Regions:
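Transmembrane helix boundary and interhelical loop/hinge segments in multi-pass membrane proteins
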Residues: 82-91, 190-198
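Amphipathic cytosolic juxtamembrane alpha-helices at the membrane-cytosol interface
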Residues: 1, 5, 25-29, 33, ...
């Protein structure tokens, strides 16, 4: 659920930012991209680890927002590139000529034309966010130890007592994590190939 929740937030924020940046271009695009560049050069994992130790009443919701705080930038840059390729198309120019507002053009004209790219990014992002949550939980900086997750189970198996007495404990969670991640990635890559083929046809 953490991976899905983070993906929902990053997709919504990244999509809106990418639409605005790619559609308007110019100074607006430059300012937004400089903010995105700054956030992307920050060390994500160390900052999240530090914040988890200083934030009071830390819980799963806090973890979701901490991961999403960095993840939206990748999504924004991804969608911006597609919007830049769409804003000069005939249907966009026709909408501007007819007097449609920028908001209407972005969300009623441009957005439907990048739907396939949104689906692909959602699928691939889920796998990545699951990996981030698992890594943090394994290091005891993710979900609280009382919250069940693949990361906490693998981290629990790493306890010295369990390593000696139950060395197999990490295996089920690790196998399940690999199966989930590989399955999601295969689906995402298949969708990406289908989307690329459709774009070439157009």
């Amino acid at each position: 659920m953490i991976g899905i929740s983070v993906t929902v937030i990053t997709e919504i924020v990244g999509l809106v930012v990418g639409l605005v940046s790619g559609y308007f271009g110019g100074a607006i695009d430059s300012v937004i991209m400089r903010v995105v560049d700054f956030i992307q050069i920050l060390p994500q994992m160390p900052i999240i680890i530090v914040l988890t130790t200083v934030i009071p009443n830390y819980n799963a919701v806090t973890l979701v927002f901490l991961i999403a705080m960095f993840g939206w930038t990748v999504t924004a840059r991804y969608f911006r590139s597609f919007v830049l390729s769409q804003r000069g198309r005939d249907y966009v120019l026709a909408s501007k000529t007819s007097g449609s507002s920028n908001f209407k053009i972005m969300f009623r004209e441009v957005l439907p034309n990048i739907t396939s790219m949104i689906i692909i990014d959602v699928v691939l992002s889920i796998a990545g966010n699951i990996g981030i949550e698992t890594s943090l939980s394994f290091l005891n900086y993710g979900l609280p130890s009382t919250t069940p997750s693949l990361g906490t189970l693998i981290g629990f198996a790493n306890d010295p007592v369990n390593v000696i007495n139950r060395p197999w404990l990490w295996l089920p969670a690790t196998i399940l994590l690999l199966v989930i991640s590989l399955s999601i990635n295969y689906v995402g890559q298949a969708l990406q190939r289908a989307g690329d083929a459709r774009q070439r046809e157009n």
